[in-house]
């Protein structure tokens, strides 16, 4: 069994997280802002103002998504081999956990709408894959050469 190159894994995870954070911010502010307003209205609250602390929470969430995506990629390399195909699968698995099933629990509570869930889930399907591929491209196993499949 080979050892994980933790520095490369963290760098790849950070790159993936930055991609996820930027794309999520742009998407939520520009594409689904009206959907969020409907959720706020349904909850009987005014539109929320983003504060530095609020943005930090989003950054922590996307940091987790990025790091876990690349950690999955690193672990999956043993059975699937290094390369973009494995990165795609790591991105899909992370998407299922974070973007598909995670928000679903908030729909019956009224904190998330079906329309918002579908739109965000569809968008994050693609961004999760792109971020995983970008982060995985930076990963190299400790010691030795490797060939991407």
Where are these regions (language model features)?
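Juxtamembrane/disordered regions of integral membrane proteins
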Residues: 1-149
